[in-house]
Regions:
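Conserved MFS/SLC helix-loop-helix module at the cytosolic interface between two early adjacent transmembrane helices
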Residues: 73-111
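Helix-to-loop junctions at the C-terminal end of transmembrane segments
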Residues: 75-86, 274-287, 371
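C-terminal transmembrane helical hairpin of 12-TM major facilitator-type secondary transporters
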Residues: 289-333
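Juxtamembrane intracellular "pre-TM" segments in multi-pass secondary transporters
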Residues: 10-20, 197-230
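Helix-loop-helix hairpin linking two adjacent transmembrane segments in secondary transporters
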Residues: 150-195
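Structural signature of the two symmetry-related core transmembrane helices
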Residues: 89-103, 183, 290-304, 384
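Cytoplasmic helix-loop-helix junction between adjacent transmembrane helices
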Residues: 117-155
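Intracellular juxtamembrane helix-capping segments at the cytosolic ends
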Residues: 127-139, 328-341
Length: 411
């Protein structure tokens, strides 16, 4: 049976969510999270440019998938460390490794070297998801949704503006220059976290191996965790399908536009940044499940717009709706899982985010197949189907919860 465990004093002496200067700490966490997660999206607007530098090397098309897969592996293998180690040195250390991996990507002599570097970039960029549960653990229960929303706004800003930045730099400077720019940004984030993060004790003393083994127990223990993970995996697959193919679609004969234009869609999608704090506040007031439903429906609406209105104006409208829907569902699903067990938030986030980014990796891979077979129409059908899968999971989860409640009341 699921139990909601909350601390009477979740906010520790180093609370970054309180009034005054402590809010600067929360903003610093949001900024650092955005810097970290941006690195897994730099390659998407530049994919055509990268492929042109490595002609005949089919591995170049694997770079976005490798980055997403590296992120998923990092979530599974590194994120549990947040429950058993002091988070501050862990977070700072991951940013340093990220800087080294970006330098390796910048000097990659072949497509396969870049694929390997992309795996490491993806794995080390999971530092963003060390920061999110850290922020949640510092917040009082009544402010947890808003706190998560603020940090996740930084994450979404990083995702979206990374495409704008990399599209511009890739078009006017080169893809290697973009990775070089990422190196000092990662180091700045490391310094920022070293200066602003409070010291925070580990929530568990269990060995690393046992922490990994406990993931299976958490997965079977909490039906809410399973439902949230499946829903977000499907939604994020649709999200990455769009962004993986957008640059190829815009560079095609219909538009003949460059990577910089594909990157500009990141600015358009940045409207979705405002969904994060808003979704957090609505989740605090009306419950996170309500917001998850709304986010899944908006995602489906976005793909209907993409499929029926494939012009630039339709893409602009659709990307705003898509990013708003995905972000709303993400913040609210995290709100749900962080309430399950306060001693295991990093491990709960491990399961949730691993599933989500495996979904993203799947979405990137399948989108390339859909593009090769049906071009934009095929990708639109794929994205819509993934959103429908998320809604079906929500329906099944609600029906099972209702059946369990009825059985309990009748006993």
């Amino acid at each position: 049976m699921e139990t909601l465990q909350t601390s009477k004093a979740s906010a520790l002496p180093g609370d970054v969510t309180g009034k005054g200067t402590h809010k600067l700490g929360l903003l610093a966490m949001a900024a650092a999270s955005g810097i970290a997660v941006a690195n897994i999206y730099y390659n998407q607007p530049m994919l055509g440019i990268i492929e042109a530098e490595f002609p005949g090397q089919s591995a170049a098309t694997l770079i976005p998938t490798a980055t997403q897969l590296g992120y998923a592996l990092g979530l599974f293998l590194l994120l549990p460390l947040g429950d058993i180690l002091h988070r501050k040195p862990l977070i700072v250390g991951q940013f340093v490794v990220l800087a080294v991996a970006l330098a390796l990507a910048a000097i990659a002599p072949s497509a396969w070297t870049l694929v390997i570097a992309s795996l490491v970039v993806g794995a080390s960029a999971t530092v963003a998801q060390q920061i999110v549960p850290f922020a949640a653990s510092l917040a009082t229960p009544e402010k947890r949704g808003a706190t998560i929303g603020t940090v996740m706004a930084g994450v979404l800003a990083g995702i979206l503006f990374s495409r704008t930045l990399s599209g511009f730099v890739g078009e006017h400077g080169g893809w290697r220059e973009m990775f070089w720019i990422g190196v000092p940004l990662a180091l700045v984030a490391a310094v920022l976290m070293f200066v602003t993060l409070p010291h925070h004790r580990a929530t568990s003393s269990m060995p690393y191996g046992k922490a990994l083994r406990s993931l299976a127990h958490l997965w079977t223990r909490f039906p809410t965790l399973r439902m949230a993970t499946f829903v977000q995996a499907a939604l994020f697959a649709s999200f990455t399908a769009f962004w993986t193919i957008l640059a190829l679609y815009l560079q095609g004969p219909r538009f003949n536009l460059g990577a910089d234009v594909a990157g500009l869609f990141g600015i358009v999608g940045a409207v979705g940044v405002f969904a994060a704090p808003l979704a957090g506040r609505v989740a605090d007031k009306h419950g996170p499940s309500f917001v998850v439903w709304g986010g899944a429906i908006l995602t489906l609406v976005a793909w209907v717009v993409f499929g029926l209105w494939g012009a630039i104006a339709g893409l602009i409208v659709g990307v705003i709706v898509l990013d708003f829907g995905i972000q709303s569902a993400l913040v609210s699903n995290q709100h749900l899982i962080y309430a399950l067990d306060q001693q295991a938030r990093s491990r709960l986030n491990t399961i949730f985010m691993t599933g989500m980014f495996l979904g993203g990796s799947f979405g990137s891979a399948v989108a390339t197949v859909a593009w090769s077979q049906g071009e934009w129409t095929g990708v639109s059908i794929l994205g819509g189907m993934l959103a429908i899968i998320a809604l079906l999971v929500l329906v099944l989860g609600r029906n099972r919860s209702s059946a369990a409640s009825s059985k309990h009341e009748g006993s």
